[in-house]
């Protein structure tokens, strides 16, 4: 797995004349986006966690780009005017601690090249193409094993031409170190050394393979002719190629699984791996560390919390908590104000856990005074509740409920399946001890991984609790992973890779910005509902902004099935209500849904409703 990249962007770009006098050539725009930003987006879509950009000329452009993409680290080559690309790579080297991709900043290319390098088992690998006739080629010479033996802009200086250097290379950290050591020796006599020169020297002692893709679509933009060729011929070809690999877009307006990006879908396509390998254990540990951060404020110490993962659904994670976190001597109070609270009560009942149910309206806010009176009886050691009731979109005020429960000495167990990563939260200030969620809701991954984020002190107390469940036992799973770096049973490997990509994309967007995007979509939906004269089940001030339960129109012409099928014809999936005594349908705006897509849906909703005489 390649997780780091370096982009060399220190050059003056003088051959592009006035176009790069006041900006770096990486900021030439093609298709409305700077070419270096296109490269950054492609790297992120291929699972790159850290992008080190070596800057020089007009470095502030890259510093501003880093504000948009948290994965970017910029490092300025202060002597950029007097050094070659190797000088810029040298200043980046200390920020690289493992194998990485090395790219030039002035490239446009088909993203298939990244996949090809990342997926290849060879550790040091140069991407090459067939003949481009660009007029500024760097030719590569190879031996019988397709390993680099020479490179030059003068093809007559080489014995054979294996391909042309693209400017994207996969290297190990040790190879980078050899390149830097060689460059250091020659600072005085070769001050303007290019990275290719140092790589060729390293190739004398380390195999550096060449991967030639004969018809690879790319262009390095060094002069105005290159730019014209890129705009007219190369870029349209790249766009066409990448569109061919795009997955058909279906906008899921159901409450989960949610719509995912193509990059999350494609993250599942990886080389087979035994989940007992250390590399996969490292991946799971990284996920555990990252997942809890989305539920904690920056000032909260993450060492006080642990993430425990299972191959299961969100309901599975709920069952983990309920069955594992209440001792035989305890008593559980379950708040039931929707199907998911009722589900937690059902789980407790099946395990015969001593329990009472606090029943409340499915669409009106909880009576907090009545709830506190129940807490004050001091009958209960544990509280189980749902943060966001997916049945209706009702958001329970956990910032009041859980601290109130803690006041009465209760351990709090929370289903945050439909709240986590959709809104900022801090388990510590909320007073949540155990929180369940899943990979397929607001974190925007694929279905298959359930997890519990635990207050570590409370988790340790469960060590001696009765083991009511084998597969879903919380402490056993936690202790086994801590000891072996493995789960007790086979994890959903490909789903874990997709979850990793979803985590990276959540870090890029941030939970706060995701909440704002979800809210923008919700505002569009609510405005359309009101304009049509439809009614929402839950008052706006008590809604989550994630899911909206809409009362079905009172006309015999209405049919949910007909509305569902009409929406499906236009690539939208909607979901029926789950309240037995109230007829509703639900529209969710979670996942990778954009405001423009919600606008398109509301147009279709209006079209259907007007067709049956509603909102006319």
From Swiss-Prot:
InterPro entries xrefs: Aminotrans_V_dom, MobA-like_NTP_Trfase, NH2EtPonate_pyrv_transaminase, Nucleotide-diphossugar_trans, PyrdxlP-dep_Trfase, PyrdxlP-dep_Trfase_major, PyrdxlP-dep_Trfase_small
Cofactor note: Shows weaker cytidylyltransferase activity with Ca(2+).
GO molecular function: 2-aminoethylphosphonate-pyruvate transaminase activity; metal ion binding; nucleotidyltransferase activity
The keyword Transferase is annotated on this UniProt entry: yes
Residues annotated as binding pyridoxal 5'-phosphate: 313-315, 390, 441, 490
Requisite cofactors: Mg(2+); Zn(2+); pyridoxal 5'-phosphate
Regulation: Cytidylyltransferase activity is inhibited in the presence of EDTA and is restored by the addition of Mg(2+) or Zn(2+).
Catalyses which reaction(s): (2-aminoethyl)phosphonate + CTP = CMP-(2-aminoethyl)phosphonate + diphosphate; (2-aminoethyl)phosphonate + pyruvate = phosphonoacetaldehyde + L-alanine
Pathway noted in the entry: Phosphorus metabolism; phosphonate biosynthesis
Region (2-aminoethylphosphonate cytidylyltransferase): 1-240
Pfam families membership: Aminotran_5, NTP_transf_3
Residues the entry annotates as binding Mg(2+) 1: 106, 220, 222
Superkingdom of origin: Bacteria
The EC number(s) this enzyme carries: 2.7.7.107, 2.6.1.37
2-aminoethylphosphonate aminotransferase: annotated span: 250-616
Disulfide bond annotation, renumbered to this chain: none
Biological process terms in GO annotation: organic phosphonate biosynthetic process; organic phosphonate catabolic process
Residues involved in Mg(2+) 2 binding: 136, 220, 222
Residues that bind CMP-(2-aminoethyl)phosphonate: 8, 10-11, 25, 83, 88, 104-105, 136, 153, 196
Keyword Transmembrane helix: no
Keywords in alphabetical order: Aminotransferase, Magnesium, Metal-binding, Multifunctional enzyme, Nucleotidyltransferase, Pyridoxal phosphate, Pyruvate, Transferase, Zinc
Family that this chain belongs to: In the N-terminal section; belongs to the LicC/PntC cytidylyltransferase family. In the C-terminal section; belongs to the class-V pyridoxal-phosphate-dependent aminotransferase family. PhnW subfamily.
PANTHER family given in the database record: 2-AMINOETHYLPHOSPHONATE--PYRUVATE TRANSAMINASE (PTHR42778:SF1)
Job description of the protein: Bifunctional transferase involved in the biosynthesis of cell-surface phosphonates. The aminotransferase region catalyzes the transformation of phosphonoacetaldehyde (PnAA) to 2-aminoethylphosphonate (AEP). The cytidylyltransferase region catalyzes the activation of 2-aminoethylphosphonate (AEP) to CMP-2-aminoethylphosphonate (CMP-AEP). Cannot use phosphocholine. Exhibits strong activity towards CTP, limited activity towards ATP and no activity with GTP.
Subunit record text: Homodimer.
Name of protein: Bifunctional 2-aminoethylphosphonate cytidylyltransferase/aminotransferase
Organism: Treponema denticola (strain ATCC 35405 / DSM 14222 / CIP 103919 / JCM 8153 / KCTC 15104)
Gene name, Swiss-Prot/TrEMBL: pntC
